[in-house]
Amino acid sequence: MKVKIETAANIIVILVAVVVGSVFLKDRFFSTPPEPNEVKAGDKLTNLEGWDWSAHDQTLVLGLRKGCHFCEDSAPFYQRLTTQQQGGSNATIVAVFPDAADAVKEVVQSEGLRVHALAGVPLERLKISGTPTLLLVNRSGTVVNAWIGMLSPRQELEVMKATTEPTAADLKLPDPLAKK
């Protein structure tokens, strides 16, 4: 009789341990991870100190960080972008860094980037969770397109095309509803 009671108690302890363990393991290993807070087209960005979205038809934001090897590896593409900008791009390029001003100046000069550079910008304010991140932003501060990480040649072409296509302001089409 004593053996049966001990066996029953052991079985109950094991069952309770399995139930409690499965609850913790389920939450730990099988729960849905939270959505990343990454920027996407349609997001409205807050104003940046030192930058006015409305002063530019489009702004191409380069979210960079000193020491980011993907940013360094992408520097030749960023140089081509700045050359394109001088040749008629409709997007103003601004590089934002979370780093201090002296570090930003060093990166911009060493990589030969001809861009507006803003230092000390918390990248989270722009919903940038990793570098490099490129954002095409319209004059109302809305993200038109976003590219995250080191870009493939196809993505580089997308960026080049997006920054050379005319905007609605460039087209200056007549308003069909305007009174004559």
Over which residues does each language-model region extend?
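Short acidic-hydrophobic, aromatic-tinged amphipathic segments that line or gate anion-handling sites
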Residues: 45-50, 114-121
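Short active-site neighborhood of thiol/selenol oxidoreductases, capturing the structured segment around
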Residues: 51-72, 78
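Structural microenvironment flanking redox-active thiols in thiol-disulfide oxidoreductases
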Residues: 72-111, 177-180
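Short, low-complexity, Pro/Ser/Thr/Gly-rich segments in the mature regions of secreted, periplasmic
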Residues: 167-180
